[in-house]
Structure formats: C-alpha cells, structure tokens
Amino acid sequence: MNSHATSHRGIGPEPHPFPGARPTTDGTARRTLLRTALTGAAALGAGLAATGTATADPGTAAPRPGTPDEALRELAAGNRRWRTYRERHPHENPAVRRTLATSQHPFAVVLGCIDSRVPPELVFDQGLGDLMTVRTAGEVLDEAVLGSVAYGVLELGIPLVVVLGHQSCGAVRAAVAAEQSGEHLPAHMQYLVDQIRPAIDHGKEGDARIDATVSANVRLVRSRLAAEPELAARTATGKLAVVGARYELTTQAVNRLA
C-alpha cells in the first residue's frame, strides 16, 4: 500500500540481493479438475506441466529456472537490470504470447504488497508467463492467498516462493498507527491490522518501528507459508524454497531477509 515516501531509481554497484537459496519447507497429489478449470486446458486440449522446468520460450536461448537456486539467480539478475536501467522486458513477443495461450510454466510465486510502486514483473524484469504474482496489502495471508500459493507450487511445480515486502509500506504504517491509537479501522481494513499486529516491533519508535515491522512482517508471513504441510514437504526434499525479501524504494534493490 502507498505511504508518503517517494521513490527514485538509483544506479551503481550494490550487494547481490539474493545470496543463494535457503530451502525452508511436497505434496504429490495432482488436482486435475482444478488445473483444468484455472487454465482452460480442457477447451484448448493442453494440460499444464507438472514441474517448473520447461524448454526455453520462443525467441530466447536460456532455459527456464527449474530449481530454487536457479530461480533466485534469475530474480537477482532481473532486479539488477531493473535498478540499473538495463531492462530487457523479456517474453513479450508474438511467439511467446501464442505459446502462453495453451500452457504456462512460471518459475516463481511472488507474494507481494498491492503498492503501485512495487510491481513484481517490473522489479524483477520478468515477462509474460515468468511469475505467478499474488498481491495483498502488507502481504497479508488469507485462505485465498494460501490456496493460490499452493496451486502454483503443487500444480505447476514452481520451485520458489518469495514473500516481498517493501520500504514505507502503508499497510504496515496503518497497522502500527491503529495499534498505538486503539482506533478500529473501517470495513475490511481492520483485518489487515489484526494480521500485521503480531509483527509490530515494540522495541523501536516512530519511523524506525514502521521500518522494522516491515521486515518482521515479511519474516512472519514467510514462516507461516513455510509451515504449510505440503509446502514444507517439498522444501524438505529440496524442490522448493520459501524466502523473504524486501524492496527498497530509494535504491530499487531487492534484498534477502534472513
């Protein structure tokens, strides 16, 4: 969600944003009916791949990332291109679009915030069919989000889930402010506050509390996802990594959170 910080894209060498995969938590059941309904495979006469590996898209030479490490490296390379104004805007040509009409092979699920300044496909310089993105204010989880992530991992064989928070998150700021004031937010926004509240860092004050809570919230959401039994089983076998990361509006860098 938007807060009042401004962003600009910096140029210059920065630390590698994803210094290696760290698998965190495989169900083998295949939900054919769900797969068919969500992709239109029945009408098109084509099913989805059961793994995250696939041949290179038309017009590209590199194969799709098929492991957590490969996926992390691709996201890191894409973010480097983004923050240095060297974007490729890959996988947008007519041949790719025709291929994607019958199947998809995304290599990462990105659970991010709805903030308009942090679109995952741009931040990681990826194109059509590369990322499965799920976005909620403050990366808040609910049943729809859990089901969406599970679909990507269990049905499409995606090897990487990234929980992506960001600097100056408005949802986090609102949660911190509501807790301090005791105000009950209108409509469904109170749900966001209730979900973010456990991550609030009471050891800091002011903007430092908000900033620390952004990172703490990412870690909390990541740990909840990693604890999902079917995701944990895939992680245990090395087929999946669930990681937390944070996007800095002022530098445009994505950095891995331990």
Residue ranges and their predicted role:
Residues 1-28:
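N-terminal secretory signal peptides
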Residues 29-44:
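N-terminal export leaders
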Residues 49-84, 88-92:
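C-terminal segment of N-terminal export signals and the immediately downstream linker at the start
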Residues 75, 110, 163, 244:
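Divalent metal-coordination and catalytic microenvironments
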Residues 89-125, 129:
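N-terminal short beta-loop-beta anion/metal-coordinating cradle
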Residues 118, 122-207, 214:
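Short HxH-centered metal-ligating active-site micro-motif
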Residues 193-238:
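Polyanion-binding loop/helix "lid" in catalytic or ligand-binding cores
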Residues 242-243, 247-258:
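Accessory alpha-helical/coil subdomains and C-terminal extensions
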